[in-house]
Amino acid sequence: APAADGLGFNTAILVAPSGELVARTRKMHIPISAGYYEDTYFRAGPADGNPYPVHRPDGLGARIGMPTCWDEWFPEVARSYSLGGAEIVVYPTAIGSEPVFPAFDTQPLWQQVIVANGINSGLFMVVPNRTGDEGKVRFYGSSFISDPYGRVLVQAPRDEEAVLVADLDLDQRRDWLELFPFLLTRRPDSYTPLTTPVDAQRPYGAGHEATAVVK
């Protein structure tokens, strides 16, 4: 619901076949790049409480996380879900051509980042993406499902709707994280910079002054 600032939350929901709302998750990261207007309508989800909840709906047989779109670019999100015991992360997404650089095809980069986050956190990634056109944006579809080994199990075309079906062996998560124990060998005591806000005048990191902050 909108707060005093008039902004709402971008929220992913899970609905049972009966129509019952069984889970929801607030989007935690809001894009502010040129040509994006999401921050005009939505604010980031609250960090207090449990910002990365893991759900186990009846009948599904799996523990899932449900971040949204821009969240998928942040490895910290996938890692947080993995630490919370998620086996599958579902990213409802609406991404396509860049508003300011329409000829720049980010589809391969988008997919590589998500697959890589699944590898380094031992997760299955289920990523439905929008297709079609709206205004100056052409959404590039390409919805896909990947496993912890980095294999894309099934993928939709860029320019048409599709239903994707894949068999997921959830034991692969355990096997992968035993082979590569990323969670056990973390060094959270050394990650202080990750929890320190970035100065808007130094958006490229410490020691780099910004010439302008594009909005």
How would you label these PLM feature ranges?
Residues 1-2, 125:
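Glycine-rich, aromatic-flanked loop segments that form ligand/cofactor-binding clefts
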Residues 2-7, 134-138:
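Short loop/turn motifs at secondary-structure junctions and domain boundaries
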Residues 3-93, 97-113, 179-181:
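Active-site catalytic loop in hydrolytic enzyme cores
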Residues 121:
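Conserved donor-binding/catalytic loop of nucleotide-activated donor transferases
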